C-alpha cells in the first residue's frame, strides 16, 4: 500500500486527486484558471466538497473557459445562482466572473497568467521537506505577497490561505510530506 500525505482520506476521489494532480506543476493558463476558480469557491469549505462538485462546476462554468466567463450576462449569473450542483454563493459567483476578466488583463500584461504566477517562484517549484501535519503552513510570506498583488489588481477571494492552497494545487510548492510516495527532492 502506498504512503500518502496525511490529509488524504479513503475517498477514491481524494486519492486520485492527490496521486494525479495535487502538487504537479501546472503551466497551462486554462488549468491555472480552473484551479483559481475552484480554490476561490473552496474558501471556508472543505476541499472534498469542491472535488465532489467539480464536474458540476465544469459544466456550469463552460469548462472553465475564462474568455466566456468574463462575458457572462446577468441572466447567466442568475442561472448559476439556481444551479444546485455548485456552491451558490452570490459573492463567489460574481467574483468568478470578475476574476475571469482580471485573469485576461494579467495575460495581456505578462503574455500569460502562467508567466505572471510562476515568476513568484522563478518558474521552478519550491520543494519543502515537511514530515508532519503541524509543519505544513496555511500561509507563507510568499502567499501573502501573491494575495496582496492579486487583490491590488481587483481579484476577489484570493486571501493568503486560498493562495497557498492554490500554490500547492498547481505545484508552485511541493508540500507532499517526506513519507508520501509523491515526495520528491527535485
Regions found by a protein language model. Name each.
Residues 1-186:
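HhH-family (HhH-GPD) DNA N-glycosylase catalytic core used in base-excision repair
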Amino acid at each position: 500500500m502506498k504512503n500518502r500525505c496525511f490529509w488524504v482520506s479513503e475517498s477514491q476521489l481524494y486519492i486520485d486527486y492527490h496521486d494525479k494532480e495535487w502538487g504537479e506543476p501546472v503551466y497551462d493558463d486554462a488549468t491555472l484558471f480552473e484551479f483559481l476558480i475552484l480554490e476561490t469557491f473552496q474558501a471556508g469549505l472543505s476541499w472534498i466538497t469542491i472535488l465532489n462538485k467539480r464536474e458540476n462546476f465544469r459544466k456550469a462554468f463552460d469548462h472553465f473557459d475564462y474568455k466566456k466567463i468574463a462575458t457572462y450576462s446577468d441572466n447567466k449569473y442568475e442561472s448559476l445562482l439556481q444551479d444546485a450542483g455548485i456552491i451558490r454563493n452570490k459573492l463567489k459567483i460574481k467574483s468568478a466572473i470578475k476574476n475571469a476578466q482580471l485573469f485576461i488583463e494579467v495575460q495581456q500584461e505578462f503574455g500569460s497568467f502562467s508567466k505572471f504566477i510562476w515568476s513568484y517562484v522563478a518558474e521552478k517549484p519550491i520543494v519543502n521537506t515537511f514530515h508532519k501535519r503541524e509543519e505544513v503552513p496555511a500561509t507563507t510570506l510568499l502567499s501573502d505577497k501573491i494575495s496582496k498583488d492579486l487583490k491590488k489588481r481587483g481579484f476577489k477571494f484570493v486571501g493568503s490561505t486560498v493562495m497557498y492552497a492554490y500554490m500547492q494545487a498547481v505545484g508552485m510548492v511541493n508540500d507532499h510530506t517526506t513519507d508520501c510516495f509523491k515526495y520528491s527532492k527535485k
